[in-house]
A protein has these predicted regions:
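Topogenic membrane-insertion module of multi-pass membrane proteins
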Residues: 1-55, 177-185
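A feature for the membrane-embedded catalytic helix bundles of lipid/isoprenoid biosynthetic enzymes
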Residues: 1-5, 78-185
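Membrane-helix interfacial "entry" motifs
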Residues: 7-11, 35, 68, 72, ...
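Hydrophobic alpha-helical segments of membrane proteins, primarily the transmembrane helices
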Residues: 9-19, 41-48, 66-76, 103-107, ...
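Structural signal for hydrophobic/aromatic residues that build the beta-strand cores
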Residues: 10, 58-61, 132
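Active-site-proximal flexible loops/turns
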Residues: 17, 25, 29, 61-64, ...
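Short, flexible/disordered secondary-structure transition segments
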Residues: 31-35, 60-63, 88, 153-156
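Acidic (Asp/Glu-rich) catalytic motifs at the cytosolic membrane interface
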Residues: 39-91, 115-122, 183
Length: 185
């Protein structure tokens, strides 16, 4: 599928396009008060495009042999900011407050990115666990798909384990994933 990208297109252009897509979705969500099913679809579509372009930029850099230190930094930093936007969009689509839980998940997300960046820069190796960031994004997309209906959204707010809302279990799984990533480095 990545072969549809013309060979002469620099990989950094693809990274910039993914940044523009995610920041456009973020700006849209900041300006709306109520998140409806159309807004959830916007978030899902933006994240899907981000994942595709993020994958394609690496393939394009290898295919065209245009990989550069600037491109690597641009890619890493776009992943950090876009990852934070993914967390924000997930919280908004789930109709959750941007309070303490949001800040904790965001902090652990940044921690996982920082640890993997240091690992790559200092030790010249990169650890990929059995469940990585792509699987986490796929899980977020599945959660967002469930938020398209009121019944699906309601599932996350229903009491579950220890009479706590089910979304707490979901974000506990995410936090454990971030910790395993950091520990694996």
């Amino acid at each position: 599928l990545h072969r549809i990208v013309p060979y002469g297109v620099p990989a950094n252009y693809l990274t910039v396009v993914s940044i523009i897509i995610m920041w456009t979705a973020f700006t849209y969500f900041v300006t709306i008060e109520e998140v409806n099913s159309e807004a959830v679809l916007v978030a899902i579509f933006a994240i899907l495009l981000y994942v595709i372009f993020d994958h394609f930029d690496g393939l394009q850099a290898k295919a065209s042999q245009t990989s550069s230190p600037l491109g690597e930094i641009l890619d890493h930093y776009s992943d950090v900011f876009n990852g934070a936007i993914v967390v924000y969009l997930c919280f908004r689509c789930m109709h959750l407050q941007l309070g303490w839980l949001f800040l904790i998940v965001l902090w652990f997300n940044f921690l996982a990115f920082a640890v993997t960046y240091v690992e790559q820069r200092e030790r010249r190796e990169l650890y990929f666990g059995k469940i990585g960031s792509l699987e986490g994004v796929i899980l977020i997309l599945l959660v967002m798909l469930s938020c398209l209906s009121f019944a699906g959204l309601d599932v996350w707010h229903q009491p579950g384990l220890f009479s706590q809302p089910n979304y707490l279990l979901l974000f506990t799984v995410f936090l454990l994933g971030f910790l395993f990533t950091a520990y694996g480095c």
